[in-house]
Amino acid sequence: MSRLTLALDVMGGDIGPRITIPASIKALEKDPMLSLLLFGDSQQINPLLEQVPSALKERLRVCHCSRVVENNQGLSYALRHSKGTSMRLAIEAVQKGEAQGCVSAGNTAALMGLSKVLLQPLKGIDRPALISLLPTMDGGRTVMLDLGANIDCNANNLYQFALMGAIFAENQLDLVFPRIALLNIGIEEIKGYKSIREAADLLTGNSSLNYIGFIEGNLLLNGKADVIVSDGFVGNIALKTLEGAAKNVISLIKGKSRNHLLKPLFNWLIKLLFKDSYQRLQKINPDQYNGASLIGLTSIVVKSHGAANIEAFNNAIHDAALQARQQIPEKILAGLQK
């Protein structure tokens, strides 16, 4: 494990430092080779560090800034008024080489916009995409992109997403020749938008890619594909639907015993009978898993859920560290040049 520095926008998210600071400390405890730059309001940050052991404090630095990109700011406004904000300064730290990656739970559009401007897309990539790993019902994982960075995509955009997703899957999942599918409303060749059908033709024409055809929404988690590609509009809706369904089922299971006199026994039986299913549902519960990466840039940027809890934001930090150590941008660039 190599030494690594990450820049964190600790003011981002629905709660801010009360979540991001404990998560940062947890990340330092788990990763002895990790150092963190904490960008945010020192008056809010420092009290949360008072009980932190000095050995951990040596691996973090508070970078004070009083300005924040608000969640309700539109993209153009956020970009024009981003100077001196915790989000922009964290990304600039990566741009300057002071950190090897950035993590933020802040305004998604602003994070993507600033990252594109300051870090630049890789040569050969027109648009970066949001990518994440999802659990499958057979116990494995699948890569899915785009999850919201690009609402409208042409065939070449989708083709590039597939290339990046395949390289990401090879490294994150240790796969050879990962199976690629396009998310569509049917599996027949005539189905879907023109851009999807044209992307299918491009993928079919590349013998170095293992394109297996279209996949429908009801099969996203069945393990049929290792990489699932869509535009950001469809991908974001699909992801939020999966997350919402998982949370609702988990709440339903827990709620059955809410007023039961034998609640402890009932809870034990639920865990025993539905242990495997419950654990798999938890993996797509945004409270448990977290972190979508903005792939296709020259550096690592991970977007955490705005409503992330401590464990979830810690997972986003872990994802950023892993991708930086795996040199994902460099491997994508090398793959594009083959």
From Swiss-Prot:
Pfam families registered for this protein in UniProt: FA_synthesis
Swiss-Prot/TrEMBL catalytic activity: a fatty acyl-[ACP] + phosphate = an acyl phosphate + holo-[ACP]
Gene3D superfamilies for this protein: Isopropylmalate Dehydrogenase
Localization terms from the record: Cytoplasm
Molecular-function annotations in GO: phosphate:acyl-[acyl carrier protein] acyltransferase activity
InterPro entries listed in its UniProt record: FA_synthesis (IPR003664), Phospholipid_synth_PlsX-like (IPR012281)
Keywords in alphabetical order: Cytoplasm, Lipid biosynthesis, Lipid metabolism, Phospholipid biosynthesis, Phospholipid metabolism, Transferase
Entry's Gene Ontology BP terms: fatty acid biosynthetic process; phospholipid biosynthetic process
EC assignment: 2.3.1.274
Pathway of action: Lipid metabolism; phospholipid metabolism
Predominant place of localization: cytoplasm
SUPFAM superfamilies: Isocitrate/Isopropylmalate dehydrogenase-like
Annotated function: Catalyzes the reversible formation of acyl-phosphate (acyl-PO(4)) from acyl-[acyl-carrier-protein] (acyl-ACP). This enzyme utilizes acyl-ACP as fatty acyl donor, but not acyl-CoA.
Family according to the record: Belongs to the PlsX family.
Protein name stated in the entry: Phosphate acyltransferase
Taxonomic source organism: Mannheimia succiniciproducens (strain KCTC 0769BP / MBEL55E)
